[in-house]
């Protein structure tokens, strides 16, 4: 009887210890996620950059390969892609080069269309652009008025989005490597998120499409300056092609391009 009682006491102790340890680990993980989200909020709160020309005066992350007197370049890129079963069907891409040395912003708007029935039938067009007084203008004449309006009205999420609202989602996982300053955020966003609303309205994405988000970049998570980052939105609907929106902001040395 005594042995039986000791067995149950030991078992109860093991269960209690397991619960306490598990609870402690859960709270530690929960606290770590809160801490990382707070750090990312500092980074994302530096947006929006409503006027792209202010990037002339903004430095990117510190890089030991750059000299102190180097004049560097920001690259801003966005793309909207329609993807079928393992194949790209359509892509619109905007790439801008913000030259801090010449104080000029130049780039191109590309469109790619692939025929699902004929893999050899692919259409690619490129339209050179520049930014003047924070407005995108063409450097060559474009005859299609709808396309012209579409490109001239193009805006990046770093200009018009509410990036900090991404962190309001309860379905996110954030990781950060303090030795390399590399961070990664991934999870799901609701249809109420303002960035999701903006993209769905802009690209006529089905309102019921589910949205996954991924954010990658380099930062010490202290919000000291703008950092290299890549942002991905994945829109999926049953029986529909997947839609992917990508946007990136990178800071590079002129001599490397």
Curated annotation (Swiss-Prot):
Location of the protein in the cell: Cell membrane
One Pfam family here: DUF576
InterPro entries with a match to the protein in the record: Csa, Csa_sf
Predominant cellular place of this UniProt entry's protein: membrane
Signal peptide from the UniProt entry: none
Membrane topology: Single-pass membrane protein
Gene Ontology CC: plasma membrane
Transmembrane spans: 6-26
Record's keyword annotation contains Secreted: no
Keywords on record: Cell membrane, Membrane, Transmembrane, Transmembrane helix
Stated family: Belongs to the staphylococcal tandem lipoprotein family.
UniProt-recorded name of the protein: Uncharacterized protein SAV0210
Organism listed in the record: Staphylococcus aureus (strain Mu50 / ATCC 700699)
